[in-house]
């Protein structure tokens, strides 16, 4: 914040406005990714809790692996954070360039967030299946990681786009 105040005193208005809008774009990247992570972890955690309840009711041991499933969608927040830092490092070479960063931040954040949401749904199904059978953990993780790959691709391609645009 102090950086923006100092910047405002020494630069023309459009540069300050552009910088504020780029920082807003950066926040969109992490915020939208985090919304998806929250939704996904909520779905997976709810399923894990229900599966543990079934295990306790049947006097079966509660599998720890369900905690792994419940936490999987959190990684998309990290991808949003990495993208946020990439956008914050933007060089504002021309007035109005902020729109490029805003579109990248918003669309990337949405895509990463949707990946987390669907990963959470898959993790919820994995919790149910694994708690009942005690089998298939590796296969379930592979399928869950396929969904994760979408978020990694979005982050990587967005960063390539950001770096090529800055040239």
Region locations from a protein language model:
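Hydrophobic, small-residue-rich transmembrane alpha-helices and their short perimembrane loops
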Residues: 2-167
């Amino acid at each position: 914040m102090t950086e923006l105040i100092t910047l405002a005193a020494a630069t023309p208005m459009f540069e300050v406005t552009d910088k504020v809008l780029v920082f807003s774009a950066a926040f969109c990247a992490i915020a939208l990714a985090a919304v998806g992570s929250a939704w996904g972890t909520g779905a997976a955690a709810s399923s894990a809790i229900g599966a543990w309840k079934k295990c306790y009711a049947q006097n079966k041991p509660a599998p720890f692996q369900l905690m792994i499933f419940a936490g999987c969608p959190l990684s998309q927040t990290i991808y949003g954070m990495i993208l946020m830092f990439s956008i914050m490092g933007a060089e504002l070479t021309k007035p109005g360039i902020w729109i490029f960063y805003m579109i990248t931040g918003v669309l990337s954040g949405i895509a990463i967030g949707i990946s987390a949401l669907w990963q959470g749904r898959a993790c919820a199904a994995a919790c149910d299946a694994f708690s009942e059978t005690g089998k298939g953990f590796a296969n379930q993780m592979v399928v869950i990681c396929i969904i994760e790959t979408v978020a990694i691709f979005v982050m990587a391609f967005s960063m390539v786009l950001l770096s090529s645009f800055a040239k």
